[in-house]
């Protein structure tokens, strides 16, 4: 999942340089969603490790 987040992050950076429209705008939204999901999963895993 981190691999996909990095790929879409790079696409989002390119989209920012070229302008947010069409596929570029969609890639930016996907990158944002993957970032939030990965961040939430990382926080959950940090808290769960402490209780094991």
From Swiss-Prot:
InterPro entries the record matches: DUF1328 (IPR009760)
Spans traversing the lipid bilayer: 5-25, 27-47
Keywords of this entry: Cell membrane, Membrane, Transmembrane, Transmembrane helix
Membrane topology note: Multi-pass membrane protein
GO cellular component: plasma membrane
Top-rank taxon: Bacteria
Pfam families per the UniProt record, alphabetical: DUF1328 (PF07043)
Location of this chain's protein in the cell: Cell membrane
Family to which this protein belongs: Belongs to the UPF0391 family.
Record protein name field: UPF0391 membrane protein XCC0220
Organism, as annotated: Xanthomonas campestris pv. campestris (strain ATCC 33913 / DSM 3586 / NCPPB 528 / LMG 568 / P 25)
Phylogenetic placement of the source organism: Bacteria, Pseudomonadati, Pseudomonadota, Gammaproteobacteria, Lysobacterales
